[in-house]
Every structure is written in C-alpha cells, then in structure tokens.
Amino acid sequence: MAVMQLENGRTYRDIGAIASQLAVLNVQIDRLPMRENPAVRELLAQDILNVTEKQQILAAFQSEFEQFKRADGCQWCDLKVLHAGSQQIYALMTQSNRTHTHTDAEVLHILAGECVFGFVYPNGSQVQLMLQAEEYIKVPANTEHWFYLTPSLYLKAVQYYTTAQGWVPQYTNRKLKIKN
C-alpha cells in the first residue's frame, strides 16, 4: 500500500488522495495488480534470478509492456532485481538518492519489495512516497525527484524505457528536507 508523507509530517494512505497530491507534478500512480501466476510468484520470491528466470517474469508482464508502449512510447523494458547482496545496489543507492531529473519519463511497476520516491513541488516543498508490490508510477520527464530503497533493501520491478539516454540522472543538488 502506497504511503505519502508531506514535509509537515502529514501522511496519505489512499491511492486516490496520493494521486491528487501528485497531480500538480503530473506524476501518475496507481495499483497494477498481478494476474494469478504461481510460477511468477515463486520466481519473485527468490533473491537471485538467472537470465532465463528474468525473461520468464518479463514475458508474464508483456501485456503491460504493450500497454505502456501504446500509451507512453516505451520501447523496451528490463527487470530491476535488488537485494542486500546485489553487486549494483550501493552504486544505485549513491546515484539515485540525490535530487535529479531525467530527460525521459521514469516508469516503474513494482512487483515485489518496496522503494521510496521523493518529489520537489514547484514551491520547493518536498514529499516522499513509499511504493510496494502491485503499484505503478510514472514520473514525467524533467520532474525533480530522488529514489531510494527502504531498509529492507529489496525490490523487484519492471522499468520501462523510451530511450537509452533518458534515464541518465541530471543532478540538481537540492538539499533534501525530508527523508526517513
């Protein structure tokens, strides 16, 4: 269940209320429930996945990819698999937990685990949004934000891309006012 925390400490737990709060940024958030698929659920429960297992999971979400392709111009997707033992986890945490923008939209479908996005409103105030399994977010291009994992250090999510260059962070170096 998504949880949004404002700078003043107020929290929202209703996805509709959260979507309303993020509308000023054109950030889209919604539930995207998974179809019942025991084989995929079993794979999602594993920490480490080989290439074939990752492809099986992506194949199970092909219809979602086709939907994002039509709606958002996504060209390809990959599976982000992060856990405490991941080689790339600390590099990712260092790279993404600072305020930045991207030249493309950032589209992420959480399959397992949880993560936090933070956003900077036009007036400079900041909010944080924790996302969990079966939630989807689309952060428009050039939206100032940051991203980090919760203390569980566990996330499996499908990332959708429109270009290869679009996800390169452009750091804004804004000081974070809110971060748990």
Q: What kind of feature is each model-predicted range?
A:
Residues 101-121:
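Short, conserved beta-strand element in jelly-roll/cupin
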Residues 150-180:
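Double-stranded beta-helix
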Residues 5, 31, 78-81, 159:
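Structural signal for conserved beta-strand scaffold positions within catalytic alpha/beta enzyme cores
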Residues 76-103:
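Conserved short histidine dyad/triad with adjacent acidic residue
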